[in-house]
Amino acid sequence: MKKRILRVFLALTVFILLLSLPVRADEAELYQNSGADTLMEVLPEEAQSLLQNVGADPMETPAPDAAIKLFSALSEGFRAEWTAPARALLTLLASCVLCRLVQEFAAKELSYAVSVCGALCAAVTLLSPMASLLEQAARVTDAAAVFLLAAVPVYAGLLCTAGNTVTAPTYGALSLAAANAVSVLSSAVLIPVLRVFLAFSVASAVTSFDLKRLTDALYKVIKWALVLAVTVYTGVLSVQTIVANSAEMAGGKAAKMLVSGAIPIVGSAFSDAFSVIVSGAALVKNGVGAFGLLASLAIFLPLCIKAAAWLLICFCAGLAAEVLGLKPLASFLNGCAAALRLLIAAVCSVGAVAVVSAAVVLCVRGAYA
């Protein structure tokens, strides 16, 4: 009897060892079957180029220094494009100094007209790059929405494969709803409102209409709406994920204990082998989640850096105009700065949705870990 039990035990041990051999192959197959190979294709060309430069691939776990390489590539790209903002800053500062000199030598009645001319000169300098930034913002928000629509089903499928069968449906529903909301709101609300805000800022600076209260109210409404939307999405997704994952962890531990106790002799070995297989799925999940995080940063960070550079220029030129007493010019430059702050906030809010969606995939633990 003892010999028979020993033979059965040895046979089962060999069988379990043979099952554990193809885990790495199954991991590569899981990458292929998850649909992660399509994530690179839906990204815009600039984001693809950045990710290729840092060696990020949706079919592999990113290197530990991939984020550092990404920021290095972004800084190199900014250094190659800094000449246009620098020329604009010099032009604006020269306009401020010239307008002040003309005011000193011209009649007092012409003082306001000279300042308005300075504002018009600043408009000629800034409106073209501002319009370009708004167009890029529209493309970036659309690209983020497209990436989310492609990535969320992959994320949810990998969560299910890793044993998170409760978390995945809730996560998928919330993230897909956010992706659709981002696409609609960015094209129908955010970008048109930013254009209207910029137009009001120009009109307030070069006409007798005082639209400052209107632009200030519009600025506050947009800012708080963005903060509220991102906070609600992040809070609801985080709470739902934490609660669901806690239930899954408890259920997973109970299942492992049941298998270990129900199957004599080799129950614990079966439980450990199953944990190894699920851990392979979790590695794939984490690799795709890390790529999604890098891809989200590659989508919206280049535009944020450009907008921040132009915001710094508007701030410096506006400060110079205020010091020199050029109120219409200072009003226009401050309006442009406010529009750029809203643009950065809008793009960062969309980026935050994409980053949080990928970060949740990284943070959720497997149910049978």
Which functions belong to the PLM regions below?
Residues 120-129, 148-165, 185-193, 197:
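Mid-bilayer segments of alpha-helical transmembrane spans in multi-pass integral membrane proteins
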Residues 95-99, 127-134, 154, 158, ...:
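Alpha-helical transmembrane segments of polytopic integral membrane proteins
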Residues 101, 133-140, 202, 213, ...:
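Membrane-spanning helices that line or support transport/gating and their immediate boundary helices
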Residues 175-235:
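Loop-centered beta-sheet repeat module
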Residues 82-89, 117-127, 182, 186-190, ...:
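Hydrophobic alpha-helical transmembrane segments of multi-pass membrane proteins
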Residues 218, 324-345:
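Interfacial loop-to-transmembrane junctions
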Residues 1-115, 128-139, 143, 147-148, ...:
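Gly/Ser-rich, low-complexity
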